Amino acid sequence: MALVNEHFLKLPGSYLFSDIAKKVNTFKITHPKQDIIRLGIGDVPQPLPQACIEAMHKAVEELASKDTFRGYGPEQGYDFLRNAIVDYYKRNGVDCIEPDEVFVSDGAKSDTGNITDLFAQDNVILIPDPVYPVYVDTNIMNGRNITYIDANAENNFLPMPDHNFHADVIYICSPNNPT
């Protein structure tokens, strides 16, 4: 018989961004003439650049033909993309990255959530509060030992742990992490 992960029951009752969406919708109903600047999850401020649109069209055409169809890419990402990433950084003054050090993934959310899978179960995880919810939720689900440190106006939202405190993994969160 399959059993539920006991740590699942320790998660908050709802997801932060769902709660925010409900509050925004309620605000819009009660204040219909008020403008809202949305800075939340999944919102982008500008349309895609033309170069991205052209590359996506080309990729769709390649996927539509038996001669150019590729299926899943290499697990580390296509060489042309990894080389382009390295070239971008070199053009911008960062000349210490090699293509074999570049990992192309399905997105920051899953990677930042799963990174602690590389570490021992009993490591102490230090997480600022507030933080991007996936950092907390994935560590709770894995039964990790989490310690929180307050990020607030008094410390400029840049908390520093006490020098006597021990942590094995420390999440650093800025207002724009993980994007």
Annotate each PLM feature.
Residues D67-T179:
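Conserved core of the PLP fold type I
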Residues L3, K10-D106:
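N-terminal small-domain helix-loop-helix segment of the aminotransferase-like
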Residues L3-H7, S174-N177:
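Short glycine/proline- and acidic residue-enriched helix-loop micro-motifs
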